[in-house]
Amino acid sequence: MLPSDLVNYKKKSRKIIALTAWDSISGSIAEQANVDLVLVGDSLAMVCLGYQSTLPITLENIIYHTNAVSRGFKKKIEEQPLVVSDMPFMTYQCGEDKAVEYAGKIIQSTYAKAVKVEGAEPEIQKVISRLIRMGIPVMGHIGLTPQSYLNIGLRKQGESLASQEKIKKEASILEELGCFSIVLEHIPDLLAKEIQNSLTIPTIGIGAGNYCDGQVRVTADLLGLNDDQPPFCQPIIQGKKLFKDKLKEWVDSERLS
């Protein structure tokens, strides 16, 4: 799977499904579930490492976990899902040269075929343009951008007319820069629909309704493994309770044996 395949999926109106993964087990499960894309996201800071935000994740963390995820794949190379790695906080906000160096390390050192960059501010636009010119495919990410939570919080974006116009303009710019797809996070459904209809590249929604060309979810949220669920992700099972109850049953039975 290559980034260009996702663009072809949009042309064919084929829905794109993506999940996050953080180790070989979650990577293997995602592959066996037949997802199109596996995102090694900086959300692993909270899912795996116990942090309260995504900001502490380092470049070394992303490389380590991306390689772990890829080792879980068992299908032929051409049948494996596309792997996209997040660019951690301050690996692309620090200038074009450093961003190219850090993104290059991800692509060289892992099986990732693209990186994801949050935001579309003028400085970020320059970074994205440079990365793409250097041969590194980029997935954009607008709407709620968790790496900016210290400034904007974690609230829904695009609820005012000015915010909607800003997000629409950002989506158009990201396509012009050459992004192969864009994540739309926590924005109104109809705004996502308008953006989806205006672009030739696919939109991947998380908390952006069902009009997007695809959906991505944090696997731990979907499986109910976290105590705090985002408002836009309804778990399909209460995994934490299920695993806890089953493990407690085993512990109790072993103590009595």
Curated annotation (Swiss-Prot):
Pathway: Cofactor biosynthesis; (R)-pantothenate biosynthesis; (R)-pantoate from 3-methyl-2-oxobutanoate: step 1/2
UniProt cofactor note: Binds 1 Mg(2+) ion per subunit.
The UniProt record lists the keyword Transferase: yes
Active site feature: E185
GO MF assignments: 3-methyl-2-oxobutanoate hydroxymethyltransferase activity; magnesium ion binding
Main localization category: cytoplasm
Keywords recorded for this protein, A-Z: Cytoplasm, Magnesium, Metal-binding, Pantothenate biosynthesis, Transferase
One annotated Gene Ontology cellular component of this protein: cytoplasm
Top-rank lineage group of the source organism: Bacteria
A Pfam family that the UniProt record links to this protein: Pantoate_transf
Recorded catalytic activity of this chain's protein: 3-methyl-2-oxobutanoate + (6R)-5,10-methylene-5,6,7,8-tetrahydrofolate + H2O = 2-dehydropantoate + (6S)-5,6,7,8-tetrahydrofolate
SUPFAM superfamilies: Phosphoenolpyruvate/pyruvate domain (SSF51621)
Cofactor entry: Mg(2+)
Protein's cellular compartments: Cytoplasm
EC numbers for this chain: 2.1.2.11
Binding sites annotated in the UniProt record for Mg(2+): D42, D86, E118
Positions bound to 3-methyl-2-oxobutanoate: D42, S43, D86, K116
GO biological process: pantothenate biosynthetic process
NCBIfam families cross-referenced by the UniProt entry: panB, PRK00311.1
Function, in words: Catalyzes the reversible reaction in which hydroxymethyl group from 5,10-methylenetetrahydrofolate is transferred onto alpha-ketoisovalerate to form ketopantoate.
Family: Belongs to the PanB family.
Subunit structure: Homodecamer; pentamer of dimers.
Name of the featured protein: 3-methyl-2-oxobutanoate hydroxymethyltransferase
